[in-house]
């Protein structure tokens, strides 16, 4: 994996609040190597370590994107939903930003069936077929389509398991991480001071509660993905 420069600087991370962890009573001892200090009862993340692992993650996704690999971004916090969707669309990644259904990856055959139903319903709606149905039947199909759009809209073009999964909140997306571990899918995860850094292939120590922190980390990753995709397109 070739190392590159991703313009990751400490001042920018401090301004985004990336260094603020949880209260010292909530910490996970496994995060000790990534903590630099305690301040007013709160752990402070070592931003030099953050920069190192974020840079490694950017190198990984750049290389993968330059080879045409696929990505899935998972972030189901309500406040982060729009950010996840816009970042994923911008970098042409799949995403889940509402709810992670257990078995979404490990029961891929079932997920594929649901996606097929979703695509069929979308096509029928676009062709105006709902207008030719009884009102009650049309209403039922519209509700079903709305539900599928809400929960599967971000993966509607996903035809196979992703090559890399990016997780924005380890504790909230624990099931997604477990499914990736079972399937051997490489993962990148933000880890706050109350997390377990051993659960992902690359753990980026960072504040996973503040939007400015999440946005900064995610933007660096999707920029690297976009750069890699551009290289892939040029070399085809």
UniProtKB/Swiss-Prot annotation:
Gene of this entry: rps2
NCBIfam families according to UniProt: rpsB_bact
GO biological process: translation
Name assigned to this protein: Small ribosomal subunit protein uS2c
Pfam family, one: Ribosomal_S2
Keyword Aminoacyl-tRNA synthetase annotated: no
Family stated for the protein in its record: Belongs to the universal ribosomal protein uS2 family.
Entry GO CC: chloroplast; mitochondrial small ribosomal subunit
């Amino acid at each position: 994996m070739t190392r590159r420069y991703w313009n990751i600087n400490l001042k920018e991370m401090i301004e985004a609040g990336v260094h603020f962890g949880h209260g010292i009573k909530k910490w996970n001892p496994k995060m000790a190597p990534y903590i630099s200090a305690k301040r007013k009862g709160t752990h402070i993340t070592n931003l030099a370590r953050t920069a190192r692992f974020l840079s490694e993650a950017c190198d990984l996704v750049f290389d993968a994107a330059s080879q045409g690999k696929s990505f899935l971004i998972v972030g189901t916090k309500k406040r982060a939903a729009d950010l996840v969707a816009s970042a994923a669309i911008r970098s042409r990644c799949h995403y889940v930003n509402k709810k992670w259904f257990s078995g979404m990856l490990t029961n891929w055959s079932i997920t594929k069936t649901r996606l097929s139903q979703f695509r069929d319903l979308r096509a029928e709606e676009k062709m105006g077929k709902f207008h030719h149905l009884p009102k009650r039947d049309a209403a039922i199909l519209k509700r079903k389509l709305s539900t599928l759009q809400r929960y599967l809209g971000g993966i509607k073009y996903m035809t196979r398991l992703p090559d890399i999964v990016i997780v924005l909140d380890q504790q909230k997306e624990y099931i997604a991480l477990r499914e990736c571990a079972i399937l051997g899918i490489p993962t990148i995860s933000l880890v706050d001071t109350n997390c377990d850094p051993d659960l992902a292939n690359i753990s980026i120590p960072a504040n996973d509660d503040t939007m400015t922190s999440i946005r900064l980390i995610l933007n660096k990753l999707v920029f690297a993905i976009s750069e890699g995709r551009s290289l892939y397109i040029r070399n085809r």
